[in-house]
Amino acid sequence: MARVTVEDCLEKLDNRFELVLVAGKRAHQLQSGGKEPRVAWENDKPTVVALREIAEGLVTAESVDNPIADRSADVDELALLTQSFGE
């Protein structure tokens, strides 16, 4: 289980208040089953998974607030996977 720090997350977001809001919204999405995690779950709580996603740059304030932006990120990820498998 990789440790995530606030400093890791603040490199991706403007301030700690935005971090709290984004992490809370993302954790709620994960907990309710509305969204799939973008990192390995590793038996962590949804809040930890949300912070790990933010620290890795996989989740942004825009993608949490705007489901269309989140879907376009999924499409980009799918395109990369398709290219890597040569299909």
Swiss-Prot record:
Q: Does the keyword Nucleotidyltransferase apply?
A: yes
* Pfam families (UniProt xref): RNA_pol_Rpb6
Gene Ontology CC: one annotated term: DNA-directed RNA polymerase complex
Q: Which family does it belong to?
A: Belongs to the RNA polymerase subunit omega family.
Q: Which PANTHER family does the record match to this protein?
A: DNA-DIRECTED RNA POLYMERASE SUBUNIT OMEGA
This protein's assembly is summarised as:
The RNAP catalytic core consists of 2 alpha, 1 beta, 1 beta' and 1 omega subunit. When a sigma factor is associated with the core the holoenzyme is formed, which can initiate transcription.
Q: What is this protein called?
A: DNA-directed RNA polymerase subunit omega
Q: Which gene is this protein's source?
A: rpoZ
